[in-house]
């Protein structure tokens, strides 16, 4: 809808079945506790299959062996993914040692998976180990509450290892926002931590009895780094500093990347600027955005339920005015800010507090002991001696943060001895994939297992055209839900079918433009043929400092997406 002719504030019609499930769940309890004791199946049944997502878990199975098990008349090998709540990605070394042990002892795959939402996931948790994982997390001060489904997910915060004071302030706000928007139900504590049930009725003053219409994602961003890809998120607080001290935030609302193949009512969208707010209004504004989306978001069609669609339906000014009314403020004009990068600075960086920070490249975020590269063991050994913390980045890498000069050599030796500091190309540093096969039930094509060898081939193309040190921001996502953030890449691959992808071009290096579909449903060899041709032109015709995405737009290879609600599919 246009701003002159906005649509209805509330979408009338038959509610989706997810709304029925939430209403009947007794504040997210369902019959999960009873289901845990059912040894006849390795999975959760009925509504519980979806309700466990509010508790930070997804039920999955190993798709590599699904057909084999079906032929043997066996149910799929059900196992859970658990995603930790870890605002800003900061984790202590004590916590790291605990999660390392659990991954080794109690998961099928034995790995820790860093995600591009600054947390970690366990894959392959059998039903018998589901309660123990929650209790292990609780024992070290962690939880998995609200890391999935219709809530405010893990809050991101720029991993700035240099501006230590600014990072500390922004990180505290990320934690405060996360805590403020958490569900108040006691279901999590009752089911997983055996806390006693009390007679009083639960209340959800912010989220409501049926929670949000859809997932909701929040970031705290410290320019000039856009490492957290703010335009993938519903609500973004862009830090504004004076003399190195945080004074307030610019608010941007309504970003989101997920689409559905062929559904032209869906589109990726960048976030819209609302205005500037002083620090003291941060929580009130966060709550106002969330409750406006709670009340106005589409509960009849989950494909059109995210904040980006609400904003387009009611109009930006209407949504903004309602946030101002609920928060009791008037936004000031946006303060100046700019982004100059979004990758991680791999290697050592000295902070202004004179501590050192070592950013380690972790390909696809998968921490495991590989032949000749025992990454998992190396990080465990570092965790045993490091006095600071670890920080997970939104690029699926890991920072060994706050290393004193006296410990630097020792930690570097451990990192080098375990293959954690092997040289990597600029192209590999700027490539990312979601998990996809074999564990993700939504996967249509390979992503994490596909990317390393595909990157090799792209590197060879860059070398062939005389630009081996250049890079393309490249993302692969196994389905159009977009976890790999391909819709903010210069070259984005979106899984369509096994071995086939839609190719999107025309994003930029800063992550501020949505790429457009260039070719549909093509194979790896066809993709590489296109990349070879395009990189050849880029190498010869580019202007000084011009990135691949900007070149494809300027050269007329692809039209830029200017207004996604209207021109994303053109």
Swiss-Prot record:
Entry GO terms, CC: sulfite reductase complex (NADPH)
SUPFAM superfamilies for the chain: Nitrite and sulphite reductase 4Fe-4S domain-like (SSF56014), Nitrite/Sulfite reductase N-terminal domain-like (SSF55124)
Listed pathway(s): Sulfur metabolism; hydrogen sulfide biosynthesis; hydrogen sulfide from sulfite (NADPH route): step 1/1
Entry superkingdom: Bacteria
Residues the record lists as binding siroheme: 483
Swiss-Prot/TrEMBL cofactor(s): siroheme; [4Fe-4S] cluster
EC number: 1.8.1.2
Cofactor note as given: Binds 1 siroheme per subunit. Binds 1 [4Fe-4S] cluster per subunit.
UniProt keyword terms in alphabetical order: 4Fe-4S, Amino-acid biosynthesis, Cysteine biosynthesis, Heme, Iron, Iron-sulfur, Metal-binding, NADP, Oxidoreductase
Tagged with keyword Iron-sulfur: yes
Catalytic activity: hydrogen sulfide + 3 NADP(+) + 3 H2O = sulfite + 3 NADPH + 4 H(+)
A GO MF term: metal ion binding
Gene3D superfamilies found in the cross-reference section: Sulfite Reductase Hemoprotein, domain 1
Enzyme class: oxidoreductase
Biological process according to GO: cysteine biosynthetic process; hydrogen sulfide biosynthetic process; sulfate assimilation
InterPro entries: CysI, NiRdtase/SiRdtase_haem-b_fer, Nit/Sulf_reduc_fer-like_dom_sf, NO2/SO3_Rdtase_4Fe4S_dom, NO2/SO3_Rdtase_4Fe4S_prot, NO2/SO3_Rdtase_4Fe4S_sf, NO2/SO3_Rdtase_FeS/sirohaem_BS
Chain's role: Component of the sulfite reductase complex that catalyzes the 6-electron reduction of sulfite to sulfide. This is one of several activities required for the biosynthesis of L-cysteine from sulfate.
Family (UniProt): Belongs to the nitrite and sulfite reductase 4Fe-4S domain family.
Official protein name in the record: Sulfite reductase [NADPH] hemoprotein beta-component
Organism: Salmonella paratyphi B (strain ATCC BAA-1250 / SPB7)
